[in-house]
Amino acid sequence: FDVTRNGSKYYLTTNAAGTAYTRLDQLTIAGTSVGGATTANDITITVISVNSATGAIVDFDFAGTAQAGKFLAIGAGTNGAVSIDGDTWTAEVLPALGGGNWASIADGLQDDGSSTFRPSIVMVVADGVSTVAYSSDADTWGTTTLPGSFNATGENTVAFGQITSAIARFVVISDADQDVAYTDNGGTTWNITGTALPATGYGEMVYGAGKFVAINSGTTSAAYSTDGVAWTGVTAPATFAAVTDIVWGN
């Protein structure tokens, strides 16, 4: 059988129908063979019908839950680590950088136009350089570069937002620039909006409740955007100047 894993779902097709099977025979593919754990991610296949002469599988049913998602940790240089459960970790080699360190991660589903396959993309940006890494499995990586006019020499942050049912957007900001870079296709191509943020200094950003929110550490300034392109600045109370990071939770 050929197995395709998408999120928590498996999709199976017959590779070789075999011989000498009978109806209601059951086969098991170990979860460890398809990127998960045994027995939690095993696939149980039930033979529904066979060729009356050869016993080759004609039709089958299957059940099983795929391992969906993993933890990814990033660090200096090419150093990273992944874990399925947060307990056991495996070293992960990230793409090499000419300078700087990988510093910010975001992930989100990408709509590929079908009803069943919606691949997840994890995107990593580095501080001090314009290199961006992206992957659908946090194992095999590709790299791309932010637009040349984007000043990536500072602290850079990426966040993901589902803007509409058809627009899945990654947004990158830097505390060295007012411009905002964004991609709607998982990093394949990038767009830039000039002078989108109220000022430089915005180095932390999060998406939640339908908005991107960025903060300017050490000041009382924050900004928000529903699409990551058009931003509105706001002034927070004086105690806000001590804030250094932001997260959204529900």
Regions from the PLM with identified roles:
Residues 56-57, 87-90, 139-143, 187-191, ...:
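Beta-strand initiation motifs
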Residues 67-73, 113-124, 164-172, 210-214, ...:
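Entry beta-strands of beta-propeller and related beta-repeat scaffolds
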Residues 83, 135, 183-184, 225:
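Conserved Ser/Thr-centered positions that define the repeating blades of beta-propeller domains
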Residues 99-109, 152-162, 199-208, 241-249:
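Repeated scaffold domains used in trafficking and secretory/extracellular systems
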